[in-house]
């Protein structure tokens, strides 16, 4: 019989949320086990857009491509807009390695890759090969198909991002709004340092994946971006938020449904929630301040999406109004805050 192990905190998932949670818990008196089912930390289908949270999470300049000016295409016209908060484009493999390096010297944190979570109970979790781990706190940071979320009986509302990985760096960050092709979804071109992500984000409940792929091809053909030999990949994004704390079990990032259904943005929510959960575990009086702020912007963005979904005849006009409003720093602050 396998010996039962014990950790104060078990974190399932070594993405941005789980790694940030482990980093904040590093150096404390708490014993921490961070597991991930993948052998390598970092790789994930993701466009890579990240608005760096002010004051508590930074990345070296050499890791990102940074864009303060964005280009929006609507109705055959290109609009150029400066944004008050630049968007940083980061490769998820690089981000994972960087975050992992931040916890390597934390003697109270053990990282195990190639380790899957199975049955989950209120005080223990079963891993592959029958290992039983007892815990005081369990943190679900295991993405949109979260095992931890499923153990809590919570459903999902999944959106989808589909992208080509083009092996050359484009020079502009571009957003496509085309209601005839994408409904209330959008397309993007996100240039990384050595490659480009070009994709679409959509709701599969009202917009079939096949149509989304066709729309993406048409958008990129019209823009003149060569993609025929590029790798195509896709991933679900859970946007149904039901809470973070469930007694001694916590959800973070996409496992918590924190990503915005309007933009698909998830990394800033992941980092903030991993940080908040760790702080709450250390000090139970801490009330998840960063996530409460971010949820305010998620709610605003998803209300705008709701209006677009309910008024399909007026989407082109609504997109035009939206672009016009984005020219105003006050609206940018209202829409996405200071994160």
What are these regions (language model features)?
Residues 10, 14, 26-45:
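Glycine-rich FAD pyrophosphate-binding loop
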Residues 38-61:
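Conserved N-terminal glycine-rich FAD pyrophosphate-binding loop of Rossmann-like flavoproteins
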């Amino acid at each position: 019989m396998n010996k039962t192990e014990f950790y104060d905190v078990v974190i399932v998932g070594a993405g941005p949320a789980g790694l940030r949670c482990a980093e904040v818990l590093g150096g404390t008196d708490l014993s921490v086990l961070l597991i991930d089912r993948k052998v390598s930390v970092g790789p994930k289908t993701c466009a890579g857009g990240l608005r760096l949270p002010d004051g508590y999470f930074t990345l070296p300049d050499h890791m990102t491509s940074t864009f303060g000016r964005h280009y929006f295409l609507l109705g055959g016209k290109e609009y150029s807009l400066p944004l008050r908060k630049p968007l940083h484009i980061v490769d998820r493999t690089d981000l994972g390695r960087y975050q992992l390096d931040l916890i390597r010297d934390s003697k109270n944190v053990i990282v195990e890759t190639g380790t899957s979570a199975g049955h989950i109970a209120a005080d223990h979790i079963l891993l592959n090969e029958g290992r039983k781990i007892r815990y005081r706190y369990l943190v679900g940071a295991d993405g949109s198909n979260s095992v931890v979320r499923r153990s809590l009986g919570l459903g999902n509302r999944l959106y989808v991002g589909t992208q080509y990985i083009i092996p050359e760096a484009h020079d502009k960050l571009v957003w496509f709004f085309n209601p005839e092709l994408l409904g209330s979804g959008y397309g993007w071109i996100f240039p990384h340092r050595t490659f480009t992500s070009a994709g679409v984000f959509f709701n599969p409940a009202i917009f079939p994946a096949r149509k989304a792929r066709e729309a993406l091809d048409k958008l990129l053909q019209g823009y003149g971006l060569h993609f025929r030999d590029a790798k195509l990949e896709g991933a679900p994004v859970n946007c149904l938020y039901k809470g973070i704390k469930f007694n001694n079990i916590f959800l973070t990032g996409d496992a918590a449904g924190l990503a915005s259904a309007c933009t698909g943005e998830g990394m800033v929510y992941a980092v903030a929630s991993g940080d908040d959960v760790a702080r709450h575990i250390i000090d139970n009086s801490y009330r998840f301040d960063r996530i409460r702020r971010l949820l305010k912007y998620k709610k605003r963005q998803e209300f705008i999406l709701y209006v677009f979904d309910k008024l399909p005849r007026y989407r082109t006009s609504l997109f035009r109004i939206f672009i016009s409003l984005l020219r105003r720093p006050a609206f940018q602050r209202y829409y996405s805050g200071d994160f």
